Amino acid sequence: MTHALLHLKGRVSPDLEAQWMQQLEAVGQAHHWSELQVHQLQLVVEEWMENLLAHALAPNAGLQAILQLQDVDDELELTLSDSGQAFNPLTRPPPSLDLDLDQLQPGGWGLHFIRSLACGTHYERREDHNHLTLRFKK
């Protein structure tokens, strides 16, 4: 059974990110989730927003973001959508973890982190928006 928990929209900005962090915490408290569950969702949303701010947002572009959180049986399903250029983060190869620290290259670590927290991922480009869906065990 699916139960909608959050549906948030806004123009990408640091202020929007802070508002969404508070909303996630409030929903987590209302549903008695563990601090770890809430923190994981917040980290994922924070990383996604930071990537939008750093890579997808041209000055005054008005990039829109949408967060949907649903309770689906034994999982939480988080869908993050944006009106930026098409970008499938799931096709980017993970960074090499076999290198020494001084050999590691920048880039891709946030996406790797997001994928490592989720138990399932899906991406699609629909209606001029990127839609990244992540599933987490409750």
How would you describe each model-predicted region?
Residues 1-15, 115-138:
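Flexible, glycine-/charge-rich segments associated with ATP-binding catalytic modules
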Residues 1-43:
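Bergerat-fold GHKL ATPase/HATPase_c domain
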Residues 36-60:
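Conserved ATP-binding N-box helix of the HATPase_c
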Residues 61-70:
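A conserved short beta-strand within the histidine kinase catalytic ATPase domain
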Residues 70-78:
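Short beta-strand-loop-beta element adjacent to the nucleotide/active-site pocket used for signaling
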Residues 78-106:
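Glycine-rich/acidic phosphate-handling loop/turn and adjacent ATP-lid/helix
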Residues 103-118:
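Glycine-rich phosphate-binding loop
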